[in-house]
């Protein structure tokens, strides 16, 4: 029977899929592109809000918007491999990443990504 340390080096978590080098490249690229798209949207909205500032309360509304979006983005974009299938599932559901951009990932990753996106779609529809 192998020692626990040997088993942990091969499979850190029993149910966690392993990511090949090529999958890591695909995942990092898709992750960065999706994050860039979301940050672009935040920048556009912030510019719009800044242009509409008429009084001091509008300034604090902009600050509140930016703070909330930063918190949301920090929670959403978690690049731990143990979290990536959920991250990509959510991004797929939101339209921030496409299945085409995930092409090259093995089915053991694509299946839970699609499943989570479908779950979120059904949950939103309910």
Language-model-derived ranges and their functions:
Residues 2-126:
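Acidic, Ser/Pro/Thr-rich low-complexity regulatory regions
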């Amino acid at each position: 029977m192998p020692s626990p340390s040997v088993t942990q080096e091969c499979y850190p978590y029993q149910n966690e899929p392993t990511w090949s080098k090529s999958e890591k490249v695909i995942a990092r690229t898709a992750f960065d592109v999706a994050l860039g798209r979301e940050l672009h949207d935040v920048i556009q909205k912030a510019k719009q809000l800044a242009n509409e500032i008429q009084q001091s309360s509008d300034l604090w509304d902009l600050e509140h918007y930016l703070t909330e979006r930063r918190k949301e983005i920090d929670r959403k974009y978690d690049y731990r491999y143990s979290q990536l299938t959920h991250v990509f599932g959510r991004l797929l559901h939101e339209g921030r990443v496409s299945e085409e951009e995930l092409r090259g990932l093995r089915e053991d990753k694509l299946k839970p990504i699609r499943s989570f996106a479908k779950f979120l779609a059904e949950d939103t529809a309910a």
